Curated annotation (Swiss-Prot):
It comes from Arabidopsis thaliana (Mouse-ear cress). The keyword Secreted does not apply. It catalyses: Fe(II)-heme o + 2 A + H2O = Fe(II)-heme a + 2 AH2. This is Heme A synthase COX15. Its cofactor is heme b. Belongs to the COX15/CtaA family. Type 2 subfamily. Coiled coil: none annotated. Residues 1-98, 208-210, 277-294, 376-387, 434-457 are mitochondrial matrix.
């Protein structure tokens, strides 16, 4: 027990020194939580907890080393305590740091996968590869191999109805786009599995974390099957009401929603590894965070639903219809929004209804996040929470602007991709906000004063 306490005290000292260095060397705003001697009655009988949160500006600047040092939460708890914090990673601060870097890197890889998938769709490259192999395949490397692949594509409905007359060079472009998307996904599997195996062998991964990561890995492996299931729907002859082949909007929504779920799971888990405790300086701030959380949870749900509705806009190519704003053509609400039977189909397959839904949901998201900011602006809460709420409001405004610009300019690849990336960025901010609003552990709560004593710079 004494060895554990001594080790914990050493880790606390290192964390405090790192925070002190950050105050003198960083030009960015840093939010830290300091535990003074008055907060700790005895090193052997009371839990010691220190936590810090690096400001959003520094996060966006990409100062990874500083971020992990300042976001690390160090908890020193007696082995006999039943209220101790259960860490996801064993092996000390360095193990936490490297596991956190790996998980944040994996989340960033998934983010890039989502953006690359959007570019692949917007360049109409997704149906260029007419088969799929689980183990992967080499691209065509000879003229004969390219000719063979091109002939296979010529048998597809997309070539016959949309790209008839396409030359080989144009085909190579869309083929390479789809191939890159598939290989980037397989690369993610390797990038995730190898460090996972290493950390397991080192004994850093707890059972709880291992189960979580195994579930995410299984979901990621399933993404390949979902992706091919989606592409396969676009290789079939389209129904008569479609003028050109396209993948099923339901399958596209399933593919994108699964990708979002994997990203959110990885990002949340990474935060939990490097920041086991939320930033907390006082009981007043904890109570304020609880009030914000009551608003943040439903707002997060609205953000998620709006993002998924965007998948149906993409699946129905609805962004290339009604390219006016705020009206949809000459009217506020098109006449044909309920023309399909049964009625429910309109919300997922009717171009006019799908776009109207997305407009309404986007407006609701903007109002909801603005309302959250309004009702929390005078609350006594941690500065990190205030910064995140303000950043979320700003990102929402940017995302709405991107959406309207994409619509008015008839969905160019650049704006369409930026809009999709913006949706994931907004989800990221909501995840970060909700993670920061978690209730501290009982051991940390016991050590907190009623009112914050720390100074923030």
């Amino acid at each position: 027990m004494f060895r554990a306490v001594g080790s914990a005290l050493k880790r606390n000292k290192e964390a405090f020194n790192g925070i002190a260095r950050g105050f003198t060397t960083s030009s960015h705003r840093v939010f830290t939580s300091n535990i003074t001697a008055a907060s700790v009655t005895s090193a052997s009988s009371s839990p010691l907890a220190g936590n810090s949160f690096y400001g959003l500006r520094s996060l966006l600047k990409g100062q990874n080393a500083s971020m992990f040092r300042r976001m690390s939460t160090v908890a020193s708890i007696s082995s006999e305590s039943k209220e101790g914090l259960k860490l996801l990673v064993t092996g000390g601060p360095q193990a936490q740091k490297w596991v956190g870097i790996w998980l944040f890197g994996s989340a960033a890889w998934v983010f890039s996968m989502v953006v690359l998938g959007g570019v692949t769709r917007l360049t109409r490259s997704g149906l260029s590869m007419t088969d799929w192999k689980f183990t992967g395949e080499f691209p065509p490397l000879s003229d004969e191999a390219w000719a063979k692949e091109f002939e296979k594509y010529k048998q597809s409905p997309e070539y016959k109805r949309v790209n008839k007359g396409m030359n080989l060079e144009d085909f190579k472009f869309i083929y390479w786009m789809e191939y890159a998307h598939r290989m980037w996904g397989r690369g993610l599997g390797i990038m995730f599995a190898l460090p996972f195996s290493y950390f397991l062998r080192k004994g850093y991964i707890t059972l709880r974390l291992g189960v979580q990561l195994s579930g995410l890995f299984a979901l990621g492996a399933g993404q390949g099957f979902i992706g091919w299931w989606m592409v396969k729907s676009g290789l079939e002859e389209p129904p008569s009401e479609y003028s050109q082949p396209r993948v099923s909007p339901y399958r596209l929504a399933a593919h994108l929603t699964s990708a979002f779920a994997i990203y959110c799971g990885l990002f949340w888990t990474a935060l939990s590894v490097v920041m086991p405790e939320p930033p907390a300086e006082s009981l007043a701030w904890v109570r304020g965070a609880a009030k914000v959380k009551k608003l943040a949870l439903p707002v997060s749900l609205i953000v998620g639903i709006t993002a998924i509705s965007g998948a149906f806009v993409a699946g129905n190519d609805a962004g290339r219809a009604f390219n006016t704003f705020p009206k949809m053509g000459d009217t506020w609400i098109p006449d044909n929004i309920f023309e399909m039977k049964p009625l429910l189909r309109n919300f997922f397959e009717n171009t006019a209804t799908v776009q109207l839904d997305h407009r309404l949901l986007a407006t609701t998201t903007l109002i909801a996040i603005g309302t959250m900011w309004w009702f929390t602006r005078k609350l006594d809460i941690h500065p990190a929470v205030k910064a995140l709420i303000g950043s979320t409001v700003g990102m929402t405004a940017v995302q709405v602007t991107l959406g309207v610009s994409t619509l008015l300019s008839y969905v160019p690849v650049s704006l369409g991709s930026a809009h999709q990336a913006g949706a994931l960025t907004l989800l990221t901010l909501m995840l970060l906000l909700n993670h920061t609003l978690r209730r501290p552990s009982p051991s940390l709560l016991k050590s907190l004063p009623q009112v914050a004593k720390s100074n923030f710079s």
